[in-house]
């Protein structure tokens, strides 16, 4: 334990500690996700094929990103202008979209949303959303690749946990990705 004598020393110590805390907070907030990651093609492999997973790029509109997303959910009718505006919003978080591309075609995509909490010492929680693999590529392990990549990014960003919602039929897949069933999701939609 350190003891300080005199008011000047205490003010200095408080200022010094406050400065350290501000610097730590700035460093934590300035963490950026990687632009690209290499992920093993299969979970159990040590060496071998690696898949490049990268952040979404503006050009992905022309590579069929919205069509890929439509294989998962209602993607809506998004024009180039809407795409560019939404893409610009995602550049600095708190959500980050990653894709797998092969020969100019998007094979898989997923989103990591970062939530700053009061819990866990103002910790960071990652939410995995919108996991989709192109119908023609299913069964090749691309789902595992994209989930693995998003999980790594969440850990690198300092998340204390990463969570996701899935259907009952997809639960076995996410268990292969080392997720465990916990609690129940509730939803209230305001429009289709």
Name each region found by the language model.
Residues 133, 139-152:
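Conserved acetyl-CoA-binding loop-helix of GNAT-fold acetyltransferases
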Residues 38-82:
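Short amphipathic alpha-helix that is part of the acyltransferase structural core
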Residues 163-172, 187-191:
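Conserved beta-strand-loop-alpha-helix junction that forms the acyl-donor binding cleft
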Residues 51, 104-109, 126:
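Glycine-rich phosphate/pyrophosphate-binding loop shared by adenosine-nucleotide-utilizing enzymes
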Residues 88-99, 127, 185:
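A short helix-loop-beta-strand connector motif used in the catalytic cores of GNAT acetyltransferases and
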Residues 147, 154-166:
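Conserved GNAT acetyl-CoA-binding A-motif
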Residues 99, 105-114, 132:
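Conserved beta-strand in the GNAT
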Residues 2-29:
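Terminal signal-anchor or tail-anchor transmembrane helices
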């Amino acid at each position: 334990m350190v003891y300080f004598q005199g008011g000047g020393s205490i003010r200095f110590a408080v200022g010094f500690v406050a400065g350290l805390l501000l610097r730590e907070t700035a460093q934590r907030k300035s963490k950026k996700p990687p632009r690209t990651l290499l992920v093993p093609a299969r979970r159990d492999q040590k060496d071998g094929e690696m898949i490049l997973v990268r952040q979404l790029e503006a050009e992905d509109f022309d590579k069929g990103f919205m069509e890929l997303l439509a294989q998962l959910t209602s993607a809506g009718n998004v024009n180039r202008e809407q795409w560019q505006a939404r893409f610009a919003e995602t550049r600095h978080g708190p959500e980050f979209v990653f894709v797998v591309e092969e020969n100019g075609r998007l094979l898989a995509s997923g989103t990591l949303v970062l939530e700053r909490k009061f819990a866990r010492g103002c910790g960071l929680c990652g939410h995995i959303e919108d996991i989709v693999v192109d119908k023609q590529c299913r069964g090749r392990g691309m789902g595992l690749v994209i989930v693995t990549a998003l999980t790594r990014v969440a850990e690198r960003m300092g998340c204390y946990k990463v969570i996701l919602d899935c259907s009952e039929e997809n639960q076995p897949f996410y268990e292969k990705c080392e997720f465990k069933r916990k609690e129940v999701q509730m939803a209230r939609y305001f429009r289709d």
